[in-house]
């Protein structure tokens, strides 16, 4: 049986985006990350809460790792991607990182990415990664800064000037108070994630 300490030592990757462009980016990222990545991936995408959602099915067709709808108090497993229902946002218990919980999002409209990122920041440490992909407005900026302050790793998509309506989220994250560690394309972000996770894993093995 996994203890809280064992789960806390695992990598957690949180990805936030919005709209069709954000969905495209998330699909591209999950299609690049390896199936055996030693990290749990949490995904938040702004989308209507009053319409049927096929996000899991859409992402599962592209993802190399299995995609699940997050359940209340679910233990996070590496090599899996988790999404929330449209009318909820995802966060983690500060005192028990093994539990994934959902909240009513009605009072947190357009702040679901910040809420997820900030819950990871409450855990803190070098094994948390926050990623902001395409989307409008500025959700994710504050949360990404919180992850940076908590010694986690922060990444943002390089804003695409040809699609200016979709650059708000990454552009605001880059400009916000709290430097972004890595800025690049979806492909280079995937490479950086794999490098971070594998490098830290090798260091841990050598230290044993």
Give each language-model segment a name.
Residues 1-208:
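Conserved acid/base catalytic micro-environments in cytosolic active-site loops
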């Amino acid at each position: 049986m996994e203890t809280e300490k064992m789960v806390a030592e695992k990598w957690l990757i949180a990805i936030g985006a919005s709209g069709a462009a954000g969905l495209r980016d998330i699909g591209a990222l999950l299609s690049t990350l390896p199936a055996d990545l030693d990290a749990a991936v949490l995904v938040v995408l702004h989308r209507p809460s009053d319409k049927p959602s096929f996000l899991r099915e859409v992402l599962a067709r592209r993802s190399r790792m299995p995609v699940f709808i997050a359940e209340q108090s679910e233990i996070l497993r590496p090599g899996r991607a988790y999404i929330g229902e449209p009318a909820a946002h995802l966060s983690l218990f500060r005192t028990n990182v093994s539990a994934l919980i959902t909240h009513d999002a009605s009072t947190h409209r357009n702040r679901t990415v910040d809420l997820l990122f900030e819950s990871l920041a409450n855990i803190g440490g070098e094994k948390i990664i926050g990623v902001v992909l395409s989307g409008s407005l500025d959700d994710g900026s504050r949360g990404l800064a919180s992850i940076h302050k908590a010694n986690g790793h922060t990444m943002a998509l390089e804003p695409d000037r040809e699609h200016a309506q979709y650059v708000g989220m990454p552009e605001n994250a880059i400009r916000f108070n709290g430097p972004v560690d890595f800025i690049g394309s979806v492909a280079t972000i995937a490479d950086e994630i794999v490098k971070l996770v594998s490098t830290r894993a090798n260091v841990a093995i050598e230290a044993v």
